[in-house]
Amino acid sequence: MKKLIIIFLLILPAFISAQGKFGSIKVGIFSPVATNTGFILGYEGGKNIDEVLSIGFSIDWFNKNYIDQHLVNEFNDFYGPNSSLNELRAKTNLHAIPIMATVTASWPVADRMRVFATGGLGLEALLIWYRNYDNPDNNEFKAAFDFAWRLGSGINYEIGSRSDGFMELAYHYSQPSWQYEVKDGVTGKSKVFERKFDMSGLMMRVGFRFFF
């Protein structure tokens, strides 16, 4: 399934002809369950099918440095409480990059103003730098992937003949994960931990769309 999504996302831009194309830059905030609220930056390209529908693709980037409290609790429960050290072990630097195919419908509600509803399906890649359990001053790297979907709506305002400004509110869903084994050098106890990153949450963004 993931391979089919990747192939579809790669060939989608080739089907979008030059006529009626647009590009959008989006900035805002994203509040996934796994991390605290942070800044998110995105680009969406696409083509207008008619006066209502458009299709396209989007790519976003979200970065957060945080302490995984769920992992801290697991370390405390299994290896014994050592809050300060386990918090260091649970420090995580996460980069989320969802790539999605999108469909948007919009309708006029006033002069130069339209409301829109949008949806997307695709794949989310997480690039994760996390601390080594035995040597928490050292970073290790892992990539995780999962299916992603998004639903949203907003308001579009026509600035000029080839430019719009817009605001949108969307809900994003994805839960990439992976498993790894940790062995405590003092107790000799081993455990397989699952790092699940619940990237589901609300995002609020503003942006500009340019037609060419």
Spans of features found by a protein language model:
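Residues that define the transmembrane beta-barrel architecture of outer-membrane proteins
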Residues: Q19-K21, T37-L41, N93-I99, A143-W149, ...
